[in-house]
Each structure stands twice: as C-alpha cells, then as structure tokens.
Amino acid sequence: MPVPIRDALTFDDVLLVPKRSSVHSRKDVDLSTKLSKNIKLNIPIVSANMDTVTESSMAISMAHNGGIGIIHRFMSMEHQVEEVLKVKRSESVIIEEPYTIWPSATMADAKRLMQEKGVSGLLVVDANKKLVGIITARDLLFEENDLSRVSDLMTPMKSLHTARANTSIDEARQLLRKYKVEKLPLVDDEGHLHGLITSKDMVTIAESPQACKDSKGQLLVGAAVGIKEGYLERARALVDAGADALVVDVAHGHSDRVLNVIQKLKKELSQVDVIAGNVATPEGTKDLIAAGADAVKVGIGSGSICITRIVTGAGVPQLTAVLECAEAAEASKVPIIADGGIRNSGDITKALAVGASSVMIGSMLAGTEESPGVTVMRNGRKYKLHRGMA
C-alpha cells in the first residue's frame, strides 16, 4: 500500500519573522527552562553524551554556565562513576566526603591520590575517621624520599583551624577570612571528620550565580546508560555517585526494549529523572512518556556527522520532528530536547520556537578545550577529533 508523502522542514528551511520587542537589554532576558520534569536549567543548552564531547570537564563548564552535561557511556562503569564524582566534587558548599589518607601512607601514596583525584590536598584521618592532620601539595614540594610517611609531612591537628559540623556558610566564610586558610575541615566534638569547606568553592560560587546546582549546592550532571545487560547495575552506581538524570542512550528509542528499560529504571530509581530517546514522531513521544520518561530526546539522523539516515533511510526533518513531538508532549508537560541538527545559534532559536525546552549540542562544542577529543595538528593548526555515535 503506498504511503502518502507529506512536506516536512528542517532548520535551514525556515526563518523567524521579526516582531516588536519590549526588551531593553539582553540582560533582561530569562532563558531558564526545564531539562526534564524536575530539573531546571538556567540556559537551554545540554552537551551531548558523546565520547568526544562530554566528560567531567565539559559537564563542569556546562553546569557553571547554567546548562548541563551528560557523561557518555562509552567507558567502564567505574570510569563513568568517577567522572560523575568529579563533577559533584568540583564545587560544593560543603564537601560531605572529602578525600582522605591514613597517617601511615607514604608520600608516593599521597602524590598518586592527589593526581588521581585532581586535588591539591588530603585530610589525614585515623582508623576511627578522626581528623589528625592535613597534607597538601606544598608539603611535598621539596621532599625527595617517596617513602616518607604522611604523618611526618602533614600539618598536625593541633595546628589546624577547624569548624563545627553544623557551621553555616556565612560562619565558614568568616573563619576562612579570619584565619587566612584555604581549607576548613568540619568536625564534631570528638574530632570525627564530617566534611570540608574550601575558599576556592566560596569564590567560585560567588563568581557563578547562574550555575545549575542540586539541593546540596553541587553542580548538576547527567549520565547516559544503554539497554544491554548490566544497564541497571550501571544506573544504580551512577545514581549513588550523584547523577541527577539518567539518559537512555540509543539510536532508535521507539522500541519495546527501550520502553521496558524506562519502566524498570523508574521503578528501581524513582528519585532521578529519566530522559529517553531518540524518537522523531508523535507516536514515539507518547509511548516514551507513557512508559515513564521525564523528558524526551527528539532527533533521528539529524546530527552533523550522523549517518543513520544514509544507512537506514529512516528519519524526519528535524524542525518538523521537534514541532510534532512537542505538540504530542504538551498535555503531559514533559519537556522535549532537540537533539541534532544544531549547527549555529539561529538553529537553537528555531528549535525553541517550535516547542523544544532545550537543545543538545555536540559538534559545536567538540572543538573546545573542555571536550575530551584528541587534539591533532594539521598544517600548523590545532583540531580536535570528533565522531558520531548511537
């Protein structure tokens, strides 16, 4: 039976008609939006879950600027968990579980842990988790013996400035200023370690009022999972690490297997939002929402380096896909993420105009310093490798 052919549009096919504006300054424009049912963003930008686009560095930068990054899944579960932890630890009003080391550890152990975790200092605790000192990179600068004990190099507890476990942020700021220290450990009356506040985080918080954070003051971050065996174990580990959203990452999201995965994730991990995709039709959107999706990613083969349409012959021009899927999701108030086909800022505007709550960007961010892509030199110029994936 012949299938009727209808007109459909992509971003380059349309322009927005200029109209009268009452905005006096770009600073007056509110770009806040919903990533998903329960997650608010201050700008409608999401960095793509691609291995040449988003790992912890990109996710940190995105959240600082009001968006969010989705850590890709093309790495071991342990590595992905560590990337999420890096984002969560990068900025926090209170670091609830600061990195620690034992007094009996060696200088080599301290150096290795600092480098591995990307920190400049470690709190030294005993077997009962009582704070006994602090060791920083400065303590190791001129020490040549890698077998020297941390207990011999650290600043001991008697020389440290600490604060109560329930110290407020304002009190902590005053103590940091008063004692001119960079790190303020939080301890109880018996000396047990309960957290850490740093001057670096205080400064960063003041400089980034638009940053997207969770209820603990940590930066927001999402993480991608697949649908093959082991996805649930990975999802649990990511949520335990602090991931605020899980993205079910497959090329064709309108499938029974994806619907089953969404239902399972919502049942087992109801505390986090599940973003599902990708789809390009109203029917696909409605089915994902019915399965429990808190946001729907729209876009089949529309990415700048995606070959899905070439290989399979399947897809819908992106502007039409976003428009129709947004209409299908309107009644349920589930946000739509336009994923793919965004080649310039004008495309972002068009996607938002037809109903997307946010846009997912890959190629536009792939050449930045924050992306994990490999840097290569061509004819005296720097480039970063970028590739598509499903």
Cite the ranges covered by each PLM segment.
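Alpha/beta catalytic cores of nucleotide-metabolism and tRNA/nucleoside-modifying enzymes
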Residues: 1-20, 24, 101-102, 163-164, ...
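Bateman/CBS regulatory modules and CBS-like beta-alpha motifs in cytosolic regions of diverse proteins
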Residues: 25-42, 48-50, 79-117, 124-126, ...
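Active-site-adjacent beta->alpha loops and helix N-cap segments on the catalytic face
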Residues: 27, 76-85, 143-147, 192-212, ...
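Short beta-strand/loop segments at the ligand-binding rim of alpha/beta enzyme cores
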Residues: 40-46, 93-98, 214-224, 265-280, ...
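Catalytic cores of alpha/beta
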Residues: 57-60, 233-241, 274, 280-298, ...
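Glycine-rich phosphate-binding active-site loops on the catalytic face of alpha/beta enzymes
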Residues: 64-79, 243-255, 294-312, 342-375
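Catalytic beta/alpha-barrel core
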Residues: 71-74, 100-101, 121-123, 162-163, ...
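Short beta->alpha transition motifs characteristic of CBS
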Residues: 72-76, 119, 123, 130-146, ...
